[in-house]
Structure formats: structure tokens, C-alpha cells
Amino acid sequence: MTELEKYYNKFNEEKRLTRRHGNVEYVTSMKYIHKYLEQMEKPAILDVGAGTGRYSVALAEEGYDVTAVELVKYNLGILKAKKSSVKAYQGNAMKLSRFANESFDLVLVFGPMYHLYTFEDKLKVLLEAKRVAKKGGVIAVAYCMNEFSVITHAFKENFAKQSVKDGKLSKDFHCQTTKEDLYSYVRIEDINEKKYL
């Protein structure tokens, strides 16, 4: 069992997007998802890193054709227990080989980028999402934002000095993470780097 699987066996992913700040993320994401779906005729949706199915189940209940891929068996079990019409599979975001090229109108990548540490792994996920997305389709990607972590952990919880001392926070307030931290934090300028384009 990987460290990520151990983490999600303890962490309550099911409640994350129903809590106050998580609900803001969910409502905002759904607003943009619906904006794009309204422009599509009978869209096929792929939710990569679907967790326990917060997005995929809701979209399936709205009548959309939804397929979900989740790495963590525990989360996948919760998703499948919801008895929705979502076609759910265990899989890795870096290798979506079960799906043909250009299969989906909308590809959601809301979980995987949180946990990928290297540029190469992040690029693999983006390239796989691009491969399975139809020409003219939409790929929506979410990241863990550096500033949120700095504001909550470093300042609100008063760990700024200790984080700098431990090498977890640079003097310009950029989170310094390793693979063992399980989360990767980025800034807007990191996402917009030319090497991703």
C-alpha cells in the first residue's frame, strides 16, 4: 500500500467538499463545469482522480454520461457504493490506457495534481488528459495553491518561523515540499510556466 493510499484510508475525503471552505471550491468548480457543459451536446465526461465521487455522482444525477477513475481503492469503494450511473474504475491518472484517444468532451483533473511532485509526472497527467479529450473538448485542472497553505498553516496556525527554520517555507513564502509530504503546492506562475505549454 502506498503512502497516498494509507493517507486516504484515514482522511475523510467524503466530507472535504461539504465543509465550508470545501463547498466554496465545489460550488465554484460546478459553476464553470456547467458553463462548458451548456455548450456541448450529449457530452461524455471523464473525472480523473474522482475521489469518492463528489463531482462525478452529482453530474451523473443531472443526467450526464460520466466515467470516473480513482487511484485509491478505499475512495473508489465509497464512490461505487453510491449506486449512481457513474462508470467507475481504479486507475492511475498518468496512464489512462483503458480509454481511446479523443473519447471525452470534458476531462476533470481535480485530484491528481495535488499529489504529484515532479514536473514529469504532472506533464504525464496533462498529456493523458489531452489524449483522451476530444478535439475542441475542455480539460479542467485543479492544483493545491501555495498561498492558501501559507495563509492557513504558516500564519493562521502560527507555523511561519518554524516552517522557514525546517526548510518547508522559503523566505519568499513558497512551500518547499518533498514526495513524502503527499501534497504539492504551486503558484499561478508555476502553472503558467512555458515548459507546460
Where do the language-model regions lie?
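Class I SAM-dependent methyltransferase SAM/SAH-binding core
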Residues: R54-K95
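A short SAM/SAH-binding and catalytic strip from SAM-dependent methyltransferases
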Residues: L106-E120
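A short glycine-rich, Lys/Arg-flanked "PGG" loop and its adjoining helix->strand segment in the class I
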Residues: L123-K135
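Conserved class I S-adenosyl-L-methionine
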Residues: M1-M40, K42-G49, R54, A58, V138-G167
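Acceptor-substrate binding/catalytic loop of class I
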Residues: L116, C175-D190
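A short acidic, Gly/Pro-enriched loop at the edge of an enzyme's catalytic core
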Residues: S97-V107
